[in-house]
Amino acid sequence: MAVKIRLARGGAKKRPFYRVVIANATAPRDGDFLEKVGTYNPMLASDNSERVVLKKDRIEYWLSTGAKPTERVAKFIEKAGVTLPKNVKKEMEVKAKNRKVRPSKKESKES
């Protein structure tokens, strides 16, 4: 069973709130999950300590069992001070390298 560490959306329309969950990779985004390991509230200021709350010990456990975080969750985990496995770091670097930068509307009109 492939396991992912990802965000599950909650909250109301225009007021998102996310849970950081451990879920089967084939489960729906807001469907069943194995464990809740944190929260993310994008409505709070970026310097607010309650914006991202993670259970570091449980995340370390799941990473050691082979769970793969999504890109956004991997960024949260790194900021929290948890070291990511080498294979996850490498995947993130490859994705960032292959990401295409599109010109803005202003740049495309100017040329």
Swiss-Prot record:
Gene Ontology CC terms, in alphabetical order: cytoplasm; small ribosomal subunit
Entry-linked Gene3D superfamilies: 3.30.1320.10
GO function term, MF aspect, one: structural constituent of ribosome
Pfam families membership: Ribosomal_S16
Keywords assigned: Ribonucleoprotein, Ribosomal protein
UniProt key word NAD: no
Hydrolase among keywords: no
HAMAP family in the record: Ribosomal_bS16
Family: Belongs to the bacterial ribosomal protein bS16 family.
NCBIfam families per record: S16
Protein name: Small ribosomal subunit protein bS16
Organism: Rickettsia typhi (strain ATCC VR-144 / Wilmington)
Name of the coding gene: rpsP
